Amino acid sequence: MEQKNRILRITRTAVLIALLVVLQAALMPLNNSLITGSIVNLVLIISVMTCGLSSGLCVAAVSPVIARLFGIGPLWSLIPFIAAGNAALVVLWHFIGNRSIGEKKYKARLAALFTAAFAKFLVLYVGIVRIAIPVFLGLPEKQAAVISNMFSIPQLITALTGGTVAFFLIPRLKKAIGGEKG
């Protein structure tokens, strides 16, 4: 039974990564980072909440690489920071969103939504805007400003948007896959 569950979790993780690839490719013509970012965050949250922490972390690490390969993401040197921001989102959704506050799971998921979104924003803002760009990258001022803008408030907005959609989808998905009743 343990082996079957492991295979199922790996398969679901692969499906979520494939979904991420398809969605990023499909959204590329829109050239709208708010839509793409929100959907990526949604997939990250769904992966951790339906498949577990290891699945969520796997998708979190693969996501920025896929984005860069599609030409969506910024510089290769920023991928570790982006993966760290994704990991913060995933870890907090896992540890907060899977808890019950009183009898209500929705309270924990609401707490996860806001806490994880802010944590991802903070990791990206500090890591990229305050450390990577001024200390390591030596970018021209105009390029530094564009990248700094990408990794500030828009990241909070996309994490909150993806989290809000996930908040409503998770109970239905878990019920559909047999992971949660009602």
Name each model feature, range by range.
Residues M1-G182:
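Loop-helix junctions at membrane interfaces
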